[in-house]
């Protein structure tokens, strides 16, 4: 088996590139066959993984980047559910790995190579695999702000997220959305935000979907009705810790359920954040794909997926 480390040179303001000498130092002189591939542009990781899988090679991929890099790579392995992916989280948010442990748990190279893998679901949204989460509305607009602020020196993920929240509070909030469930029932109205979650975390550690599991075959759908700004500010600390669902405000204003499929439409093109990357949509169909890929748990780390 070959162990392929995929380096995203733009991830984490260049932190991924700094891993190259550490990878070589850890694996040279061992019996592990390995190689290092540095991506050349957006979408290159997806192409590289797809071509490698189609060639029938027995490999493991280790993504040196963030959630966006993992998103690309897993999309390259569509149709290859036995493809194995490790993650060395040097991106901005690094939310996917939070479902299993802390960042330092994933930074030891030998522990990654010697780790076992577990099956993980994905959400298929209009033909694209979502590894962690899709956000629409307030959360998505904050993510767009984070994308701007994270380019600034000394501003890290959680700080950038809080700045993004403050910036969005100054704008008109809410968007009209129309939902259709698998039983044919519909719901329409003006909502603050909607999350379609495979994992629990977004925004660099905000536990927006505390009941989510990566292997239950279900997406956690959170729909937040319009909330006055003052009340929303008050609930933010509990939104970060994942305890907001226990509040009276959530009982009145939050719809939180698990689904296998749903459809969502908006009247005008709207932003959607998919694994932290921003695009636009007017209609989407979301459907769970169970056990779509395998995720490597570093040796010695308790398996958080089970």
Which residues fall in each region the model found?
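ATP/NTP phosphate-donor binding region
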Residues: 1-61, 107, 302, 306
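Glycine-rich beta-strand-to-loop/alpha-helix junction loops that act as flexible
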Residues: 9, 64-66, 90
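Short Gly/Thr/Asp-enriched flexible loops that form oxyanion-binding sites at enzyme active sites
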Residues: 69-80
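Catalytic core of DAGKc-family lipid kinases
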Residues: 79-192
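Glycine-rich phosphate/pyrophosphate-binding beta-alpha loops
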Residues: 139, 195-209, 278
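Gly/Ser/Thr-rich active-site loops/lids in small-molecule metabolic enzymes
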Residues: 150-160, 204, 210-231
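A generic structural signal for short beta-strands and their flanking turns/coil linkers
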Residues: 173-175, 190-192, 215-220, 260-262
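ATP/nucleoside-binding phosphotransfer catalytic cores, i.e., glycine-rich phosphate-binding loops
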Residues: 181-183, 188, 213, 223-306
């Amino acid at each position: 088996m070959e162990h392929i480390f995929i380096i995203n040179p733009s991830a984490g303001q260049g932190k991924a590139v700094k891993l190259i000498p550490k990878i070589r130092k850890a694996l040279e002189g061992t019996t592990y066959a390995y190689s290092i591939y540095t991506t050349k542009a957006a979408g290159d990781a997806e192409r590289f993984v797809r071509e490698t899988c189609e060639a029938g090679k027995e490999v493991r991929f280790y993504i040196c980047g963030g959630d966006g890099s993992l998103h690309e790579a897993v999309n390259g392995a569509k149709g290859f559910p036995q493809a194995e992916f490790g993650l060395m989280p040097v991106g901005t948010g690094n939310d996917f790995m939070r479902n299993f442990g802390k960042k330092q748990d994933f930074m030891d190279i030998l522990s990654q190579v010697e780790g076992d893998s577990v099956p993980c679901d994905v959400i298929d949204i209009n033909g694209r695999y979502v590894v962690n989460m899709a956000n629409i509305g307030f959360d998505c607009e904050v993510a767009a702000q984070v994308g701007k602020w994270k380019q600034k020196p000394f501003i890290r993920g959680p700080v950038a997220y809080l700045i993004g929240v403050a910036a969005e509070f100054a704008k008109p909030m809410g968007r009209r959305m129309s939902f259709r469930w698998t039983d044919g029932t519909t719901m329409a109205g003006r909502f603050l935000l909607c999350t379609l979650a495979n994992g629990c975390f977004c925004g660099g550690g905000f536990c927006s979907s505390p009941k989510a599991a990566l292997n239950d075959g279900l997406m956690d759908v959170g729909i937040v009705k319009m909330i006055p700004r003052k009340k929303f500010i008050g609930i933010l600390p509990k939104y970060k810790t994942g305890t907001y669902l226990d509040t009276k405000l959530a009982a009145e204003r939050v719809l939180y359920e698990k689904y296998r499929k749903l459809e969502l439409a908006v009247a005008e093109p709207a932003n959607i954040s998919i694994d932290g990357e921003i695009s636009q949509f007017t209609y989407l169909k979301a459907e769970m794909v169970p056990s779509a890929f395998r995720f490597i748990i570093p040796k010695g780390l308790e398996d958080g997926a089970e």
